[in-house]
Amino acid sequence: MRNVNWGSVTATADGGDFKRPAPGGYVARLVSLEDNDAKQYVEAVFDIAEGEFANYYSDDWGQSHPYAHHFFLSYKDTALGMLKGRLESIQASNPGFDPFAAWDAGRLDMFTNRLVGINLQEEEYEYNGEVKTRLNVCQVVPVQDVRDGKVKPRDTKKLDGGNAPSTAPAVVAAPATNVYAGPIPFN
């Protein structure tokens, strides 16, 4: 165990003054992009680049939990329109950068440190039978839309009825009726 200079540490209560970003628009910086060829998508990990929450995910927790601050660029045939829209948002946010040329050249490293606007939406999920919330990217936009206040928070994405945790048992057994009570015909 290491010695700590307690004189330089400010005490906080458990849960303390931890503040997380609210749903809505943020200017984000792309930290890394990784291709998953089998599933036909690129996972884009981001950090918030401007404002009160700049570098929010750059701490140890954020670096070890990239799934908490990422979005996908799917290149399945059915999602190419959305991919093009997201690449156009990256292009509008980074004058002089051609994300289409970088994409076609397979140079995902060229996206690192590029800016993009994102809209974070709160969504419900179930964990150990309890409903919790997390932030997820619901929209990728040009950074100027965020700066101009054009990006509005969306309502919380609720669990649908089929996924909501239930306190009732899944199957209720009916009482047995007309049960055979005679001798067992085989031994």
Model features per residue range: what roles?
Residues 1-187:
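Short beta-rich binding modules
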